[in-house]
Amino acid sequence: MEVSQFDNVSVVKKANLYFDGKCVSHTVLFPDGTRKTLGVIFPAALTFNTGAPEIMEINAGTCRVRLAGSEDWQTYGAGQQFSVPGNSSFDIEVQETLDYVCHFA
């Protein structure tokens, strides 16, 4: 899944701002109808809710993640990814700026 760039895509100019600007992303639309978001999360402890299943690919930085229903925290860094079921949530703790790609199923 790791690629250095996405070709032949459209990018929505308006940024997605969440949690008072602690998470900022842009939506990327692919010719086949799929979408991804490219973004950063600044240092914070946040809870995200999902509609569709997501795969979070970490490009830079590290984070701790706890999926809904779990008591265990997992640490992820550059080159790693984690999956979140649809209609669920996850907690994320970021100590340094996290650069990510969110792949929607």
Swiss-Prot record:
Listed EC numbers: 2.4.2.1, 2.4.2.2
Keyword entries, A-Z: Glycosyltransferase, Transferase
Enzyme class per UniProt: transferase
The keyword Ion transport is annotated on this UniProt entry: no
SUPFAM superfamilies referenced in this protein's UniProt entry, alphabetically: RmlC-like cupins
Pfam families: Ppnp
Entry keyword Transferase: yes
Cross-referenced Gene3D superfamilies: Jelly Rolls
InterPro entries given in the database record: Ppnp, RmlC-like_jellyroll, RmlC_Cupin_sf
One Gene Ontology CC term in the entry: cytosol
GO molecular function: guanosine phosphorylase activity; purine-nucleoside phosphorylase activity; thymidine phosphorylase activity; uridine phosphorylase activity
Reactions that this protein is recorded to catalyse: a purine D-ribonucleoside + phosphate = a purine nucleobase + alpha-D-ribose 1-phosphate; adenosine + phosphate = alpha-D-ribose 1-phosphate + adenine; cytidine + phosphate = cytosine + alpha-D-ribose 1-phosphate; guanosine + phosphate = alpha-D-ribose 1-phosphate + guanine
Signal peptide: none
HAMAP family recorded: Nucleos_phosphorylase_PpnP
Sequence similarity: Belongs to the nucleoside phosphorylase PpnP family.
Function (record text): Catalyzes the phosphorolysis of diverse nucleosides, yielding D-ribose 1-phosphate and the respective free bases. Can use uridine, adenosine, guanosine, cytidine, thymidine, inosine and xanthosine as substrates. Also catalyzes the reverse reactions.
Protein name as annotated: Pyrimidine/purine nucleoside phosphorylase
Encoding gene (name): ppnP
